[in-house]
Amino acid sequence: MSSKHWNYKQDLVHAHLKGLCHANPDLQFIESERVVINKHSKPDKVMILSGGGSGHEPLHAGFVGEGCLDVGVAGFVFASPSTKQIVSGLKAKPSDKGTLIVVKNYTGDILHFGLAAERAKAEGVPVELLIVQDDVSVGRTKNGMVGRRGLAGTSLVHKIVGAKAAKDSNKASLSEVYQLGEAVVANLVTIGASLDHCTIPGNRHHESESDDEDEQKHLLKEDEIEVGMGIHNESGIKRVSPIPTIDTLVADLLKYLLDKSDEERHYVDFDSSDEVVLMINNLGGTSNLELYAIQNTVVEQLATDYKIKPARVYTGAYTTSLDGPGFSITLLNVTRAGGKEVFDCLDYPTKVPGWNSSYTTAEWAAKSESFVIDAPPVSDASATSKVRFSSSTVKAVLESGCKKLLTKEPKITLYDTVAGDGDCGETLANGAHAILDLLAADKLEITDGVRSLTQITDVVETAMGGTSGGLYSIFISALAKSLKDRELQQGGYEVTPQILAASLKDALESLYRYTRARAGDRTLIDALAPFVEQFAASKGDLNQANKACHEGAESTRKLKAKFGRASYVSEEEFKPFEAEGGLPDPGAIGLAALVDGFAEAYSKIGSNL
């Protein structure tokens, strides 16, 4: 086979979302923000918004429509959408009764959707954030503060809370919808298995053809499967060889879901008297012929080994991993989650494509020719300040930092291929290119400190997804706020190194409100915190701060990950990097490169900010 994906001239995510709207008359598309909305949603009900990285279709946009989601926000492949996109989705469908945001438990999603929720609350909009974490493959000891991953159970949550908000003339309150969603999440378990990793469009068509020895060591062998593999190619519980029969594999998976003696993975009780929902989810590359055979095996073993007879059985592609050749099993204890009300919501009619429905002839005839609409304004683009930077200094420093970061992108990508999902280098490069383009077009209002930082935040939010985009956007936005707050107190001023040091500390404290990561947790914070602290301690000496930043980044080679997808990776996969001192955190290395570029340019100029 020459390739596993077609070649596309246009952005694949945009093309997919537009195609989805062509095929579904009820949908509209905010093209600039990759937001799909149900054009029939009314403000007299709780709005349901969800989203995340692309590559899991039909999640999330495929669940937008009557009786399910009102808004779906799409990031790039395997990368969270930006806060700006999510805010656009919130503003596109405001509700008198508030909005429930449903998000899978991944760091980037929590950061971006959490920040969007906080912004909405600050404007007086009632918002609740419901986090789905149904994976049982990562045990209690290993998941620590990170929690369980969000998997196929997310699609059941979408259907249930969407119906709860839509059904009946006396519409449910935000609190009622959220409480039902919480009960469902608390009684939901999922585990998957796969024959191989998925392949990502635009990358080489299969990792096995790589000559890179490090990549080869992480591949599944020809007669091997991975139990518990995540939906972004994350490592699972174990690898099994030779490939077992489906009967043996299903028995193993059901034990992880239902064994009450397993202290690591026993998250939900299931008794023979409980009413249970079963979902068999296609990870994207399993044939329907096999999928229904697998489902039959699961149903039979539930009955014979556990005396459980599912009251509802759903089989299909609900939460995929691109072309992943695997499947997952999800069980929902309806008795404990809410009983009849849960079934009423599951059975509530909907036409969303993710729930295998269809439209009538009359609805097709009424389909509008155009579904593209303008995005609502998200921020005040005209906001200005009297906080002053030196134009020539800031431009030189930014250019140098971004260019230095771009030289490190291949190495960062290599590190993140092992420690994450491989997108960190590209994500940082996207941000660097966006800032360089802004400078080249002479559109950055550099002399206005607050305005220029706000502009940088906007382009970073647009260009960067994932965890890195969230961290950088929050930090830069908080830095701008700190400088603005000082102006409100004392009037206009020139930014000195000492003032910048104080505002950097304010920005770091603001960032800490949105992540539990601290120095020592093997994240970007290990480079950022020392930089900020040393910049303040040295009264604005960028060279000393740069040294501290580098030392912090290098220290991550010896640290154990506690956050993000790196926390799921086995120690065995880090061994190929022992010769260079260990595998560092990719985000920390990226920040160190950026700061190094800043320091190089600043040393040459030797002037004020």
From Swiss-Prot:
GO biological process terms on file: anaerobic glycerol catabolic process
Task of the protein: Catalyzes both the phosphorylation of dihydroxyacetone and of glyceraldehyde.
Keyword Nucleotide-binding: yes
NCBIfam families to which the protein is assigned, alphabetical: dak_ATP
EC number(s) reported in the record: 2.7.1.28, 2.7.1.29
Active-site residues, as the UniProt record annotates them: H232
Pfam families cross-referenced by the UniProt entry: Dak1, Dak2
The keyword rRNA processing appears for this protein: no
Native source organism of the sequence: Pichia angusta (Yeast)
Stretches assigned to the DhaK domain: 8-355
Keywords of the record: ATP-binding, Glycerol metabolism, Kinase, Nucleotide-binding, Transferase
List of residues binding substrate: G53, S54, G55, H56, K104, D109
Stated family: Belongs to the dihydroxyacetone kinase (DAK) family.
Intrachain S-S bonds: none
Pathway field: Polyol metabolism; glycerol fermentation; glycerone phosphate from glycerol (oxidative route): step 2/2
Listed name of the protein: Dihydroxyacetone kinase
Molecular-function annotations in GO: ATP binding; glycerone kinase activity; triokinase activity
Alphabetized SUPFAM superfamilies for the sequence: DAK1/DegV-like, DhaL-like
Catalysed reactions listed for this entry: dihydroxyacetone + ATP = dihydroxyacetone phosphate + ADP + H(+); D-glyceraldehyde + ATP = D-glyceraldehyde 3-phosphate + ADP + H(+)
GO cellular component: cytosol
Residues that bind ATP: D421, G422, D423, C424, T467, S468, T523, L524, D585, P586, G587
Every DhaL domain range: 392-600
